[in-house]
């Protein structure tokens, strides 16, 4: 029978890259660690690790096992925290997975309220570049709740937070007729070099899709990983940028226009199963206070 201790040993060996370092981190002797790993492999019917002179490498069976081991350990830790919280014996931690742009623009007001009301519960943010990575991490049990674009076909509970609006940022010194209406046709910016997002960033895909719908492929003057950097670079004159409206600071020097065809995405909080009371309370705080 597989035990949580054995799964913890497996994950630690993989993460540290050696039995010696894993034994030190786990505060056990190396023979005891090796014995538990052999017992785990015997129980599963095959080798999980290939022992190399200076490292270890997962076998195909080990690669298949590892994500399930991580998910089981995460579930066990959440169960422990939930039980101890219910008994009032300890503070807890919420693991919140999200994408970079949401942690920047949507989350801060809700986190401020949560911290005020629940100072005993820490929040650990796990941030991803793309919504697909976020969905995969949540499916693997790496967080209590995920916040981001609604994943198609998600099998668990989904709670809609609202619709995120995108705006176009332009340099402050380039006023045009569009400023009077506050609206810009993206097709008029087809010849511009854009402030774009790095490949692999979920917003890069959104910009490409939006511009394609307007009849052109955006040419990048510069690419950035940071959502917060895009409007600053655009305001400095490097080119137009398409950004979530909620990431703009209160005082901002650039020109901000709405696309003539609105660009929006629905954001949601989603979990693998019915949320525990603590996670459910956090989701309610998001619904009430997130900036969407």
Language-model segments: residues:
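Beta-alpha-beta core module
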Residues: 155-160, 164, 228-274
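A short LG(V/I)-centered, amphipathic sequence patch enriched
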Residues: 41-60
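Short helix-boundary/capping micro-motifs
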Residues: 11-29
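Central regulatory/effector-binding core of bacterial HTH transcription factors
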Residues: 91-153
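Secondary-structure junction motif
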Residues: 177-178, 182-185, 192-214, 276-283
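Hydrophobic hinge/microswitch elements
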Residues: 131-134, 139-142, 149, 200-255
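Alpha-helical linker/hinge and terminal dimerization helices associated
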Residues: 7, 43-44, 65-87
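Acidic, Gly/Pro-rich loop/turn segments at junctions of secondary structure
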Residues: 128-192, 246-251
């Amino acid at each position: 029978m597989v035990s949580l201790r054995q799964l913890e040993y497996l994950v630690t060996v993989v993460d540290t890259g050696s039995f010696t370092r894993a034994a030190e981190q786990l505060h056990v002797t190396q023979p005891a660690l090796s014995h538990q790993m052999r017992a785990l492999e015997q129980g599963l019917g095959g080798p999980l690790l290939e022992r190399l002179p200076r490292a270890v490498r997962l076998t195909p069976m080990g690669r298949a096992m590892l994500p399930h081991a991580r998910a089981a350990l995460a579930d066990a830790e959440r169960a422990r925290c939930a039980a101890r919280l219910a008994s009032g014996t300890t503070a807890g931690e919420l693991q919140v997975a999200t994408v970079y742009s949401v942690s920047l623009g949507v989350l801060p007001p809700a986190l401020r309220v949560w911290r005020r009301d629940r100072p005993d519960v820490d929040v650990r943010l796990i941030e991803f570049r793309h919504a697909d990575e976020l969905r995969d991490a949540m499916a693997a049990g790496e967080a209590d709740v995920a916040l981001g674009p609604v994943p198609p076909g998600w099998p668990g509970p989904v709670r809609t937070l609202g619709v995120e609006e995108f705006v176009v940022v332009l340099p402050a010194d380039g006023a045009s007729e569009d400023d009077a209406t506050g609206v810009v046709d993206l097709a008029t910016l087809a010849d511009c070099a854009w402030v774009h997002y790095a490949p692999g960033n979920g917003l890069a895909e959104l910009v490409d899709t939006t511009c394609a719908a307007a009849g052109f492929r955006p040419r990048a003057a510069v690419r950035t990983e940071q959502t917060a950097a895009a409007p600053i670079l655009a305001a400095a004159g490097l080119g137009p940028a398409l950004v979530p409206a909620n990431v703009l600071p209160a005082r901002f020097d650039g020109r901000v226009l709405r696309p003539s065809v609105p660009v929006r995405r629905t954001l949601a909080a989603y979990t693998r199963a019915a949320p525990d009371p603590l996670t459910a309370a956090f989701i309610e705080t998001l619904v009430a206070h997130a900036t969407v």
